[in-house]
Amino acid sequence: MNLIYLIYNRPDCVEQSLPVILEACPKQVYLVADGPKSGNEEDARKCERARQRALDMLDGVCEVHTDFAEENRGCARRVSSGITQAFEVFDDAIILEDDCVP
């Protein structure tokens, strides 16, 4: 199974959802993250923590591809562009956001 996992600035959601997702033993994960809002240091810290937490949890578990935006693109544009990029790598995938606990 291939997974496209969409995250933003919620490390707590990553910590809740990713362990459950990993029980399904994904072969590859394409990690898509929007960037922090301009000038918002707290948002930048949360984005970085969410990214790092996801990477730490995925390390050694499966093949990981990353697509991390440097600046905030907004939900609609970031989700669309991230999924488009992921399907350049994957033929098929399950798509989940960090706040979806299967």
Specify the residue positions occupied by each region the protein language model found.
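N-proximal low-complexity "stem/linker" segments adjacent to membrane-targeting elements
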Residues: 1-23
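Structural beta-sheet core signal
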Residues: 3-5, 31, 95
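A short, glycine-/small-residue-rich helix N-cap motif at loop->alpha-helix starts
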Residues: 70-78
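Active-site nucleotide-sugar/metal-binding loop of Leloir-type enzymes
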Residues: 80-92
